[in-house]
């Protein structure tokens, strides 16, 4: 069982690392397990380090405020994000310019100081008495990998001073102070020209440019710059805090060195990963530049490479042609040049048309190929798809039969079905009549022969064999014909109705669905066997007996459902 110790966090934070643990309870001490002491000690160390760091930051911020208060008196930041900066009205667009190739590493505070310096310069050169006047309203920027593009929006209230301020900025960034250049759109340039038309331009000495360059250089080296912030962020990103609770099985004397080794190992892994990533990015950038170079070379070859590549041939041809052209008159030479240009233009047009036709043909061929390939795959798997989806397709056909859009020529169909029913009834009534007419001659023959036989029996009593035989045969034929006609007359309507129900059952596909439902697999042989059994025996009990071996106790339910579907 783990022992319990008593610790005093207050003594530990005050620096008394010897007496902060006790084995007996004391006032101000809290109980804790011995195995949890390293983790608790680490949390106290982190709390002390954060407290010391906060104190150092507060002292440094106070000293920086006192040091920078005399040198720069910056107001609140005029930076806004790019979405809020976008000009809405035409007046805002005319009062917006940008500084391209602005150096990295200044930070938002540094760019604010640059904006204040530009305001001071404009007020000084335009001799504005009010020191609180601000020409620059707000600014924003776009990161362009190696440089920044800073967008500046001036106050709309200034009209006359705006043109002079833009002239001062153009002169300030004329020679490319630290690579910075002033850019504006055509409407803004025309607006500035209209404002400054007829007024003398303000001169700007070199000292102002030098001071501005020195300001940018100084701001880039300040501790609050973007480069140093990125460095601090990169260093803080690889700091690790090892969980001591996972190392509770190890002795406390070796925990510090083990934690240092773990942090060093993980930091090394992160560093190697960063170096690998930077190397991949550099290679990718190099590859991208190489691809762009190849693209530009290809464009040069397609546009003017043929002319450069065939320079020697062109020179030799030109020398030969010069000798011929010298013999022509001036008019012939002009006609020759015009004809040559016309032929070249036709050739270029034909080549362009040929290229467009080739591209269109390739596109159409690709589309046809893809469509034919899809059609081939569909036809190749048609039987499998049809066999696999036979049940859902039959259900879909049943649903489509009840669809209102399927109800085309419904009255004609109903009239035809009624006519078919009447034909079936008439046919069933005519068949027994035909059979009865076929048996009528036999009965007449019997009626004619019977009196003769009776007279013969009266006259000749001994002739029994010769006269009895035809009489018996005729009577048998008559009785057999009557029984057959009666049976056919009785069974014909019933068999026709049963056969009609069986056909409807066969067309509905109910038997297929039930077999697939109870078996889990569609068996066409079993379905055909069920129909043959129903047609042959016309008995529910016989079908149930035959299906008992296949469906076991489900056969009565299956047969009853089949019979219900057939009786509907």
From Swiss-Prot:
It is found in: Cytoplasm; Nucleus. SMART domains: PWI. This is U1 small nuclear ribonucleoprotein component SNU71. The keyword Repeat does not apply. Residues 43-71, 299-335, 407-464 are annotated as: Disordered. Keywords: Coiled coil, Cytoplasm, mRNA processing, mRNA splicing, Nucleus, Ribonucleoprotein, RNA-binding, Spliceosome. It comes from the Eukaryota. Residues 314-335, 439-454 have a biased composition (Acidic residues). It holds the Pfam family SNU71_RBD. The gene is SNU71. GO terms for biological process: mRNA processing; RNA splicing. It comes from Kluyveromyces lactis (strain ATCC 8585 / CBS 2359 / DSM 70799 / NBRC 1267 / NRRL Y-1140 / WM37).
């Amino acid at each position: 069982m783990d022992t319990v110790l008593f610790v005093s966090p207050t003594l530990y934070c005050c620096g008394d690392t010897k007496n902060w643990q006790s084995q007996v309870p004391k006032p101000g001490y809290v109980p804790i397990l011995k195995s949890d002491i390293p983790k608790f000690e680490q949390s106290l160390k982190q709390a002390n380090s954060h407290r010391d760091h906060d104190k150092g930051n507060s002292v440094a911020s106070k000293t920086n405020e006192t040091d920078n208060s005399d040198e720069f008196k910056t107001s609140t930041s005029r930076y806004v994000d790019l979405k809020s900066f976008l000009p809405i009205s035409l007046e805002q667009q005319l009062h917006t310019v940008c500084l391209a190739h602005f150096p990295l590493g200044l930070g938002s505070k540094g760019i604010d100081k640059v904006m204040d310096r530009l305001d001071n310069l404009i007020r000084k050169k335009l001799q504005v008495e009010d020191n609180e006047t601000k020409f620059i309203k707000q600014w924003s920027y776009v990161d362009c990998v190696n440089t920044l593009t800073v967008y500046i929006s001036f106050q709309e209230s200034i009209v006359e001073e705006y043109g002079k301020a833009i002239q001062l900025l153009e002169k300030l960034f004329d020679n490319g102070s630290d690579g910075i250049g002033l850019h504006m759109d055509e409407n803004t340039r025309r607006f500035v020209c209209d404002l400054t038309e007829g007024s003398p331009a303000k001169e700007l000495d070199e000292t102002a440019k030098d001071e501005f360059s020195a300001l940018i250089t100084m701001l880039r080296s300040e501790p609050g710059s973007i480069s140093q912030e990125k460095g601090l962020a990169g260093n803080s990103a690889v700091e690790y805090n090892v969980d001591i609770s996972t190392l509770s099985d190890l002795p406390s004397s070796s925990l510090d060195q083990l934690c240092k080794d773990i942090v060093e190992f993980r930091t090394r892994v992160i560093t190697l990963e960063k170096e690998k990533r930077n190397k991949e990015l550099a290679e990718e950038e190099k590859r991208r530049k190489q691809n762009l170079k190849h693209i530009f070379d290809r464009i040069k070859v397609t546009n003017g490479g043929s002319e450069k590549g065939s320079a020697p041939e062109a020179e030799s041809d030109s020398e030969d042609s010069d000798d011929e052209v010298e013999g022509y008159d001036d008019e012939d030479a002009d006609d020759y040049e015009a004809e040559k240009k016309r032929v070249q233009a036709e050739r270029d047009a034909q080549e362009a048309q040929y290229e467009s036709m080739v591209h269109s043909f390739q596109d159409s061929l690709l589309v046809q190929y893809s469509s034919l390939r899809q059609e081939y795959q569909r036809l190749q798997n048609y039987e499998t798809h049809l066999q696999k989806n036979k049940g859902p397709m039959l259900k879909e056909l049943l649903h489509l039969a009840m669809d209102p859009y399927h109800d085309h020529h419904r009255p004609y169909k109903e009239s035809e079905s009624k006519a078919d029913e009447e034909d079936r009834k008439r046919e069933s009534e005519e068949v027994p009549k035909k059979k009865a007419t076929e048996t009528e001659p036999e009965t007449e023959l019997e009626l004619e022969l019977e009196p003769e036989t009776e007279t013969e029996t009266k006259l000749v009593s001994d002739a029994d064999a010769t006269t009895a035989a035809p009489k018996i045969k005729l009577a048998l034929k008559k009785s057999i014909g009557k029984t057959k006609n009666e049976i056919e007359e009785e069974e014909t309507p019933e068999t026709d109705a049963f056969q009609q129900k069986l056909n409807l059952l066969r067309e509905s596909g109910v038997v297929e669905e039930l077999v697939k439902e109870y078996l889990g697999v569609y068996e066409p042989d079993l379905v055909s066997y069920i129909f043959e059994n129903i047609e042959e025996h016309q008995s529910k009990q016989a079908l149930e007996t035959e299906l008992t071996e296949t469906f076991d106790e489900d056969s009565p339910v299956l047969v009853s459902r089949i019979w219900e579907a057939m009786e509907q």
